[in-house]
UniProtKB/Swiss-Prot annotation:
Disulfide bonds: none annotated. This is Recombination-promoting nuclease RpnC. Signal peptide: none annotated. InterPro entries: Rpn/YhgA-like_nuclease, RpnA, Transposase_31. A low activity DNA endonuclease yielding 3'-hydroxyl ends. Upon expression enhances RecA-independent DNA recombination 2.9-fold, concomitantly reducing viability by 59% and inducing DNA damage as measured by induction of the SOS repair response. Disruption phenotype: A quadruple rpnA-rpnB-rpnC-rpnD deletion shows no change in basal RecA-independent recombination. Its EC number is 3.1.21.-. GO terms for biological process: DNA recombination. Belongs to the Rpn/YhgA-like nuclease family.
């Protein structure tokens, strides 16, 4: 059964706390001293909107205020939970609502995160409030959660990782090497390293196909014939470079009529020719006869 959108609790709560003077009294009384000292409650301003999920609006109500905190924008988010039994997920919900308020602040063209102070107003049957208000306590390992979320997040900055180190990364090495250099270098300069990694046998046939098509779309080399020819010779598993028909299927394009397919084939062939590939290799890749490739060459 759908929860009602409003309740008597909802109505009376908002009737009081939507008034600035009443809200100021509430916050002066109930905000912890260390937080109250951060806030200039004379700047308190009621904000529009709600962060409560639709499925919970019959059980929860919220009010959001903006306020200056030590001269910077901040928010106070008050949630009233009017269920008879407290929600075991409430601490996590409060964190999620706070992040939603931060996100809305960023969407308004701000480039810094505001401090959002979540406040729960509880009036349930169980007394005192029986649950922790620390979201870390909801984790299987609260101490580990504190370490993870109170520290900078792990960063894999491949741009500063030496190539020699990347070459030791086994199955992920070929992807990292390409991601590092795809924009900056002629792919021919990577050929020796790519061949070494392919010969080590870590890369599957389907991964090689994906890698080669990625290089065709995003990479650059002045010696495309030699580069792609060498790579084809090193392939394993019997898989060759993706034909255009396969490319169509992967991209969801193989749905049109033959005329549409022919036009896209010619466009693809033109891109390959512009990268310096021979007409024979382009014909194989684009799945077109040499006569069609010659027509494309005449159009370039």
């Amino acid at each position: 059964m759908d929860a009602p959108s409003t309740t008597p609790h909802d109505a009376v709560f908002k009737q009081f706390l939507m008034h600035a003077e009443t809200a100021r009294d509430f916050l002066e009384i109930h905000l912890p001293v260390e937080l109250r000292e951060l806030c200039d409650l004379n700047t308190l301003h009621l904000e529009s909107g709600s962060f409560i999920e639709e499925s919970l609006k019959g059980h929860s109500t919220d009010v959001l205020y903006s306020v200056q905190m030590q001269g910077n924008p901040g928010y106070l988010h008050v949630v009233i939970e009017h269920q008879s039994k407290p929600d075991k997920k409430m601490a996590f919900r409060m964190m999620r609502y706070s992040i939603a308020a931060m996100h809305r602040h960023l969407e308004a063209d701000h480039d810094k995160l505001p401090l959002v102070v979540p406040i729960l107003f509880y009036q349930g049957e169980a007394t005192p409030y029986p649950l922790s208000m620390c979201w870390f306590d909801m984790f299987y390992s609260p101490e580990l959660a504190r370490r993870v979320y109170n520290s900078p997040f792990p960063l894999v900055d491949i741009t500063i990782t030496p190539d020699d180190e990347i070459m030791q990364h086994r199955r992920i090495a070929i992807l990292e090497l390409l991601q590092k250099h795809i924009r900056q270098r002629d792919l021919m300069l990577l050929l020796e390293q790519l061949v070494t990694l392919i010969d080590e046998g870590y890369t599957s046939g389907s991964q090689l196909v994906a890698m080669q098509n990625y290089m065709l779309q995003r990479g650059h080399t002045e010696q495309a014939d030699l580069f792609y020819g060498v790579l084809r010779d090193r392939e394993t598993g019997g898989e060759s470079m993706m034909t255009l028909a396969q490319w169509f299927e992967e991209k969801g394009i193989e749905k049109g009529i033959q005329q549409g397919r022919q036009e896209v084939s010619q466009e693809f062939a033109q891109r390959l020719l512009s990268k310096g590939m021979s007409r024979e290799d382009v014909a194989e890749m684009a799945n077109l006869p040499l006569a069609e490739i010659d027509k494309v060459i005449n159009l370039i």
